Amino acid sequence: MVTAFANAGYSAVLWIDPYPTRLPKLSDLKRLRNAKSVVAHSDERIELHRPAALPVEPLPLGSLLNQMLCWRPVRQRLREFAAGGHCVIGIGRPSALALWALKNLPHERSFADVLDNFPAFYRGVSRLSMKRRLKDVCRTVTDVFCSSNQLALDIQAVRHDAITVLNGYPTDHLPQPSIMATRKYVGYLGTIGEWFDWPLVCEIARALPEIPVRLVGPEFVPRPADLPPNIEFLGERPFNEMADFVRDFAVGLIPFKRNELTDSVDPIKFYEYRSLGVPVWSTDFGEMRLRDANDGVNKIQRGQDWRALWDEARVTVVEPHAIASFKEAVSWAKRGNVPGVVEG
């Protein structure tokens, strides 16, 4: 979406990286140990700024501490940027800094891009804090866009004019899909978190013992003790390698549990798989509830005939024109074309 803004005629885009908006947990130590350096955005039209912040925002004086100790440089840069002329403010993750920008920077228009049920990721005081920030942001901006129909329904309790703008994907420079005969993996691309249905994935692996089940992405929950030997872990990999991994998938998995967190999700991996002609096996959750075989999706649950599903996937042929049409429809050039906001 950021590149879509740059391509739409804006002379510059200032991207403020999200900072911690909840209290720290012990599992964060593992994230810090495994953290890899991120390459700065290569588009010279896009400026990246990573603000310093203490992980205390949910506390009564947390925002004040960050205002006093950490945010002077980012506030100054935001003021300079907004003073340059026609300015649109976009809010991804609700935060105290986002609210400060909405209230203090001159701008022509503003929008909230609600990608997830943010409070569902948090617990306790952090959850209450995020609920409040989300409501405040949605009431303050001029437009609210939600990445799934369920999110739009939920947010309409606060903003009746919230609309659904489904996720997009940068499809312009994707390679051509591979031929099915060269694909050998049941694959998953993405984070392995509390929403990941481990029992289902293990059942699939045991039913297809000669087929490698390849998992690509960071892990934030423990692995089961009795993992089948054909499950492979590749860990977190750079974004520019994702297409090459997906091209090796005979099937793309989206094995999510159905709960409060996933009920409003439109998974990016659906677009990644489909843009490269990969058949999708998905549980019935969130926006995936509205997709079926016409969308290249096979709904899965425990107890299915996995051998029959695998054999069916191996003979599935996705026509090149169907892939091209899908890629065009979900590109950010189409998805991000929101009148009055994206045009520079």
Regions from the PLM with identified roles:
Residues 1-34, 206-208:
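N-terminal subdomain of nucleotide-sugar transferases
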Residues 73-86, 112, 122, 126-144:
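Membrane-proximal helix-turn-helix segments that form the acceptor-binding/catalytic region
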Residues 121, 140-161, 289-291:
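A short, active-site helix/loop in glycosyltransferases that binds the activated sugar's phosphate group
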Residues 150, 165-171, 177-182:
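Carbohydrate-associated surface elements
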Residues 179-196, 201-205, 214-216:
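Conserved donor-binding/catalytic core segment of Leloir-type glycosyltransferases
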Residues 196, 240, 244-245, 254-275, ...:
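Nucleotide-sugar-dependent
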Residues 221-248:
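Nucleotide-activated donor-binding/catalytic signature segment of Leloir-type glycosyltransferases, i.e.
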Residues 300-344:
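A charged, aromatic-enriched C-terminal amphipathic alpha-helix characteristic of glycosyltransferases
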